[in-house]
């Protein structure tokens, strides 16, 4: 074989090898493409099933919180949550907050709170003793967790707020703006649905605890006017975040602030703060048409702070030590009442629950049950009610619950900031225990030194 033939033969062999290799590569590509198409096709077929399941789950999850049941019979209070946010905040990213409250849907309970746009142990925590600023926002996190940027959900810009769930979506009410012209922004499922303008131009404010929902309608109480004299008070009825009706209370010589409201047998009862001249708590109860009754808790076991020593009560405002006050709550059971209050008569310290079997209508100071919650040597603060509906608990009654704010920092302690943690309890008809569940943080922090 001459050299030219050798070259032609070698070239032919290389060409054949190249063609075979190319065909193998093409076959490999086709095989991969077919395999991918089959997998993609399977995924496309599965997605409608997944979406169908998701939509079905949502449809089942959406209910109407009827609120028609009565409050559950209870004999005491079982501890429900404690977030330890100040202790955790000494080294972790935890919001500076005040006015925490709890509200439950048919699926979960969440802690709502008013931030100061700052974290604990940070320079922006300085001066956060101030109640109303443009930096304050309503946020929420799962109950029992310390509120941080990593687990919290923005709800509204607000220095006064309320929130509740009707079985379909969360309703939030956030008040912000200047003292002489604040506006409440209503959101339903996170979307602005309505607004309420200050009608007396004097610090429009609301509950700082959950609103109450019955049969798809939700209700709240707002105040506008002096904190130390006659003000104006309105009940609002809302449906899917829109105000459908309101009524102004005819309540001369009454003072309502920061009401704690709950449903009971299809009606709403609110127990509030008298910052003008009452050391006992005013109440307002109303039906779904906003037909209302008003009064004061008659018991000689006084519920506000500051207050006189227990004695003879009144079904009107108790004037001794009646000025100023603190947000609180009570639960009515017929003529009886569970009263939550600070242990101290003149400072926001300690907390206890007292059962007065005749206290809603009777003026004596006798009671049959007292359960310690926080020792008098530890700080407390605001407190308020919330409920767990049968749709959440599976019970045939509405479970009464309450939370207590444990304020730390200014003005009572040597810090540059004011914040708080919270604890909560729910009513049970079984064994409970009296103890002290204080905030427990060691102050001052590094930023305070």
Curated annotation (Swiss-Prot):
Residues 71-449 are annotated as: Head of neuraminidase. Substrate binds at residues 98, 132, 257-258, 273, 348. Disulfide bonds join 72-397, 104-109, 164-211, 213-218, 259-272, 261-270, 298-315, 401-426. Residues 11-33 are annotated as: Involved in apical transport and lipid raft association. Ca(2+) binds at residues 274, 278, 304. Residues 28-449 are virion surface. Glycans are attached at residues 68, 126, 215. Residues 36-70 are annotated as: Hypervariable stalk region. Gene3D superfamilies: 2.120.10.10. Keywords: Calcium, Disulfide bond, Glycoprotein, Glycosidase, Host cell membrane, Host membrane, Hydrolase, Membrane, Metal-binding, Signal-anchor, Transmembrane, Transmembrane helix, Virion. The chain crosses the membrane at residues 7-27. GO terms for cellular component: host cell plasma membrane; membrane; virion membrane. GO terms for biological process: carbohydrate metabolic process; viral budding from plasma membrane. It catalyses: Hydrolysis of alpha-(2->3)-, alpha-(2->6)-, alpha-(2->8)- glycosidic linkages of terminal sialic acid residues in oligosaccharides, glycoproteins, glycolipids, colominic acid and synthetic substrates. Inhibited by the neuraminidase inhibitors zanamivir (Relenza) and oseltamivir (Tamiflu). These drugs interfere with the release of progeny virus from infected cells and are effective against all influenza strains. Resistance to neuraminidase inhibitors is quite rare. Its EC number is 3.2.1.18. N-glycosylated. It is found in: Virion membrane; Host apical cell membrane. Residues 1-6 are intravirion. It is a single-pass type II membrane protein. Homotetramer. Intact N-terminus is essential for virion morphogenesis. Possesses two apical sorting signals, one in the ectodomain, which is likely to be a glycan, and the other in the transmembrane domain. The transmembrane domain also plays a role in lipid raft association. The influenza A genome consist of 8 RNA segments. Genetic variation of hemagglutinin and/or neuraminidase genes results in the emergence of new influenza strains. The mechanism of variation can be the result of point mutations or the result of genetic reassortment between segments of two different strains. Belongs to the glycosyl hydrolase 34 family. Catalyzes the removal of terminal sialic acid residues from viral and cellular glycoconjugates. Cleaves off the terminal sialic acids on the glycosylated HA during virus budding to facilitate virus release. Additionally helps virus spread through the circulation by further removing sialic acids from the cell surface. These cleavages prevent self-aggregation and ensure the efficient spread of the progeny virus from cell to cell. Otherwise, infection would be limited to one round of replication. This is Neuraminidase.
């Amino acid at each position: 074989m001459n050299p030219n033939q050798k070259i032609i033969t070698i070239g032919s062999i290389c060409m054949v090898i190249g063609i075979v290799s190319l065909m193998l590569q093409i076959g490999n590509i086709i095989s991969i493409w077919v395999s991918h198409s089959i997998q993609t096709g399977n995924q496309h077929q599965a997605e409608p099933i997944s979406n169908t399941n998701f939509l079905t789950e949502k449809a089942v999850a959406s209910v109407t919180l009827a609120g028609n049941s009565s409050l559950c019979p209870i004999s005491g209070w079982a501890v429900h949550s404690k977030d330890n946010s100040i202790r955790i905040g000494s080294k972790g990213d935890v919001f500076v907050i005040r006015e925490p409250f709890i509200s439950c849907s048919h699926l979960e309970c969440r802690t709502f709170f008013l931030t100061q746009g700052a974290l604990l142990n940070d320079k922006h925590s300085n001066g956060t003793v101030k109640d109303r600023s443009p930096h304050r926002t309503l946020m929420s996190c799962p109950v029992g967790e310390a509120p941080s940027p990593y687990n919290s959900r923005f709800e509204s810009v607000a220095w006064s707020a309320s929130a509740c769930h009707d079985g379909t979506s969360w309703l939030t009410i956030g008040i912000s703006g200047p003292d002489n012209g604040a506006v409440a922004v209503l959101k339903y499922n996170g979307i602005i649905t309505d607004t309420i303008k200050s009608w007396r131009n004097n610090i429009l404010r609301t509950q700082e605890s959950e609103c109450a929902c019955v049969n798809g309608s939700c209700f709240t109480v707002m105040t506008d006017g002096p904190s130390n004299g006659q003000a104006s008070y309105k009940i609002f009825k809302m449906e899917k975040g829109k105000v459908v009706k309101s009524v102004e209370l005819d309540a001369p010589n009454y003072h309502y602030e920061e009401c704690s409201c709950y449903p009971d047998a299809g009606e709403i009862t609110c127990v509030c703060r008298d910052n003008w001249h009452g050391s006992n708590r005013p109440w307002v109860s109303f039906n779904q048409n906003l037909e209302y009754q008003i009064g004061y808790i008659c018991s000689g076991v006084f519920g506000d702070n500051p207050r006189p020593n227990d004695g003879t009560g009144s079904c009107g405002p108790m004037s001794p030590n009646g000025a100023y006050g603190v947000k609180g709550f009570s639960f009515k059971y017929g003529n009886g009442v569970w009263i939550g209050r600070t242990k101290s008569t003149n400072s926001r310290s300690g907390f206890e629950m007292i059962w007065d079997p005749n206290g809603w209508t009777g003026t004596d100071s006798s009671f049959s049950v007292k359960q310690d919650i926080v020792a008098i040597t530890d700080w407390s603060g605001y407190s308020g009610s919330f409920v767990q509906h049968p749709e959440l608990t599976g019970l045939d009654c509405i479970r009464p619950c309450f939370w207590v704010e444990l304020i730390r920092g200014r003005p009572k302690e040597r810090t540059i900031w004011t914040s708080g943690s919270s604890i909560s309890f729910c009513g049970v008809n079984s064994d409970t225990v009296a103890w002290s569940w204080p905030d427990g943080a060691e102050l001052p922090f590094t930023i305070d030194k």
